Amino acid sequence: MSERIFVLVVLAAFAAGCGSDDEAPSATQPTTSAPSLAGTYERSLTHADIERTDHLRDESGPGQEKPQPGPLKLGLERGTLTMTDVGAGVTIRQDYSATSDGAFRIGAYQAPDQGAFCGPDVPQTAAYTWKQSGDVLRLKADQDECADRDSSLSGQWQRR
């Protein structure tokens, strides 16, 4: 009986290896990076930006509070997103990547002890889309559970 099982296993292995030697194209084609986004941008955070994300907001952790309206700066360089809340004097750095098809992915904090959008219970990662027209960059949250990051990043940014 065990010899019969062995033979069946060997035959199954051979059958699995049968087929064309041609490589099938991948289901998705890789997109290229979007180096044209590199640079420094500015925008103003408004009351409307903050109110738009109130349904996501949880400021229950120590030292957490809503952002205040005011000037923001955004730097995009070599996989690093740097956002500065000028009025609060807070700078936050996160990994990011952008592709030519408009995907904008935000990864881990680079120095969470120096600044973070949300507390440790909120995922660090997020998915946005981007569009650029001339010197204007528009970011829009697709999936972001952090209200403060969404309030701050979603909107039109002017290149400086």
Regions found by a protein language model. Name each.
Residues 47-53, 58, 66-70, 74-144:
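Contiguous, well-ordered beta-strand patches that form the walls/edges
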Residues 14-17:
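C-terminal motif of bacterial Sec signal peptides marking the signal peptidase cleavage site
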Residues 26, 124-129, 152-159:
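Extracellular/mature segments of secreted proteins
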Residues 33-66, 157-159:
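Tryptophan-anchored aromatic micro-motifs
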Residues 1-6:
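Bacterial N-terminal signal peptides that target proteins for export
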Residues 19-38:
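Short, low-complexity, disordered segments immediately C-terminal to signal peptides
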